[in-house]
């Protein structure tokens, strides 16, 4: 029997190999799965810990370079802890990979000694909006803004995407004990095709750890307002 995933402005998807159309009537290639999360709190800088916890349940995730793992959404009153409350975890994946992620529902996850559990996910179609925002994008050796802009421009050219760049806040995260430097990034003036391409392919490295993943600015702002990042 096919298992169903909830929907928002998109056709109901059944994990049974059927053709899925988004709310523009086009074939959906990538989607976002939003899992409700209970438990915590977790460290504010938790991207590597989250990916490690997910990989313990889904070892094949290491090999899926086409999947993105966003940082958890929650509320932070300090610069150290994220309180999840009615938080969510967002995974971006090809439509054909949805079924492989459903075993995460109710799977016990442990992050920094705190137990988390995931509820049944809802499915969200990617939106071809003209502006996109990423909280953190990283490129090798792009330690300052000038080097970052050059690397981001090369990445867009490689994707065949035309856009205006606006670089935001410089951020530092820790991955396997090492400091990684990146910047927030806005893209403007995107065509519908290019907008979807950026969301599907991402930019830069470490997309399993919340980097290089884009959302429409309004949605990204709502996420950030619930989880103030260091």
UniProtKB/Swiss-Prot annotation:
Pfam families: Cas6. Keywords: Antiviral defense, Endonuclease, Hydrolase, Nuclease, RNA-binding. Its EC number is 3.1.-.-. Induction: Part of an operon going from at least MXAN_7266 to MXAN_7259 that includes a CRISPR operon with transcription continuing into the pre-crRNA locus. Coiled coil: none annotated. It is an enzyme of class 3 (hydrolase). CRISPR (clustered regularly interspaced short palindromic repeat) is an adaptive immune system that provides protection against mobile genetic elements (viruses, transposable elements and conjugative plasmids). CRISPR clusters contain sequences complementary to antecedent mobile elements and target invading nucleic acids. CRISPR clusters are transcribed and processed into CRISPR RNA (crRNA). Processes pre-crRNA into individual crRNA units. InterPro entries: CRISPR-assoc_prot_Cas6/Cmx6. The keyword RNA-binding applies. One of its GO terms (molecular function) is RNA binding. GO terms for biological process: defense response to virus. This is CRISPR-associated endonuclease Cas6. It comes from the Bacteria. The gene is cas6. Belongs to the CRISPR-associated protein Cas6/Cse3/CasE family. Subtype Myxan subfamily.
């Amino acid at each position: 029997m096919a298992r169903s995933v909830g929907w928002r402005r998109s056709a109901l998807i059944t994990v049974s190999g059927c053709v899925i159309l988004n709310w523009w009537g086009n074939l959906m290639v990538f989607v976002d799965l939003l899992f409700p999360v209970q438990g915590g709190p977790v460290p504010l800088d938790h991207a590597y810990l989250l990916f490690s916890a997910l990989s313990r349940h889904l070892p094949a995730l290491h090999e899926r370079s086409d999947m993105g793992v966003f940082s958890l959404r929650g509320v932070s009153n300090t610069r150290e802890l994220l309180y999840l409350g009615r938080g969510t975890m967002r995974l971006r994946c090809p439509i054909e990979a949805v079924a492989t992620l459903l075993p995460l529902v109710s799977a016990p996850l442990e992050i920094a000694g705190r137990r988390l559990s995931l509820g049944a996910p809802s499915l969200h179609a990617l939106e071809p909006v003209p502006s996109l925002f990423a909280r953190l994008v990283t490129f090798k050796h792009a330690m300052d803004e000038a080097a970052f802009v050059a690397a981001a421009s090369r990445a867009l050219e490689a994707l065949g995407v035309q856009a205006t760049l606006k670089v935001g806040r410089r951020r530092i995260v820790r991955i396997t004990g090492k400091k990684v430097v990146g910047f927030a990034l806005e893209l403007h003036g995107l065509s519908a095709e290019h907008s979807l391409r950026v969301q599907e392919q991402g930019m830069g490295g470490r997309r399993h750890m919340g980097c290089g993943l884009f959302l429409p600015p309004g949605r990204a702002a709502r996420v950030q307002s619930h989880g103030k990042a260091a």
